[in-house]
Amino acid sequence: MIGNNKKMTIQEIIHGPKVTSMKEAMSRGEWHSGCSWCKRLEETTGTSGRTVRYASPETLAAIDADMNFFKLEHLVVNWSNLCNLTCVYCNDQTSTAWQSVKKIPINYVKNEHEDLIELARTQGHNIQGLSLGGGEPLLQKGLDVFLSHLNPATVSVMVTTNLSMEITTNPIYQILKTWPTVEWMVSFDNANKEKFEYVRDRAIWEQFVKNIRQMKQDGQQVNAHPAYSIYCALDLEEYYDFCVSENLGIYWCELNHPMELDIRRHSQTLRDLAVEEINRVIDKYGDRRSLAIDVLKTYRNTLQDNSYLKYQENFKSSETLAWHIEIENTLKKTNKFVELWPTLAKEIQ
């Protein structure tokens, strides 16, 4: 953490000692400990938020001339943990729906909105790239005010959403669908109704598909944004078939926790099956663009050699079933992991 914006202003954080130490490490061409997530992503997928964001030559020259130069060109905003779903691999820290299930008093973990809105007011004209996360960004109150300080003509927006709500009446979607450059990253891991609703608890498959088709009808750029895990590793062909049929791009993300869900930690038998599934997808769609085939090839390498994994000695595959039983009891699920993923369940017993 580089600063707590409940105790410091954003300006104090930007010019504080931790950000300064990160800048100094970057100027030496070194990875700072605070950049470990980007480092891991680049090692496993070849790309990260750091590599996909563009800095103008003028900005780079100004940074070279003065390490403390500040111009806000790219901004990632996780407005709050307000969310309507209880996804099985989420928790009560990042989803208010999970807080409700666990009967924890609702505690919105949020940025200081007025401070962010002031930042947008003073720097909004410079912003070229904006990433919106959550909780669920389409449910965030006050986000419309923040957006009003930006110039839709000059900013590229990326929104990560579970797309489970009715979007035709959603105020944030109604604003952003009119902006010229918005990329929607839709978080889902399965293209099967029962498996989708198991993982994305409280979401309805039919509403989800309806929303995707509405977005396409509205001329939006829509990507599937799955997390590579045991839930999709043996169903990749089905997933890719769905994405191709709906004309979706694919942008993979990492899922490393809980460890039980990382397919690369499981047995050689399961990893071999996952490799076979990747090979089927590559054979079928290897010549298609925007389907992240290169990432699948990287995943294949990590399945074949998982020696890079940390804390593997602490991993017990057999605990995966117990983990799911606990989740199923907590969420009062009628569908069961062992019934939906029988091959996985049989191998990890």
Spans of model-derived segments:
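Alpha-helix boundary recognition
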Residues: 14-15, 27, 121, 177, ...
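Core AdoMet radical
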Residues: 72-82, 93-112, 125-140, 152-168, ...
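Helicase-associated low-complexity regulatory tails and linkers flanking the ATPase motor
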Residues: 107-119, 146
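A short acidic, amphipathic alpha-helical/loop segment
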Residues: 119, 142-149, 169-175, 198, ...
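Conserved C-terminal portion of the radical SAM core fold
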Residues: 156-158, 179-185, 204-348
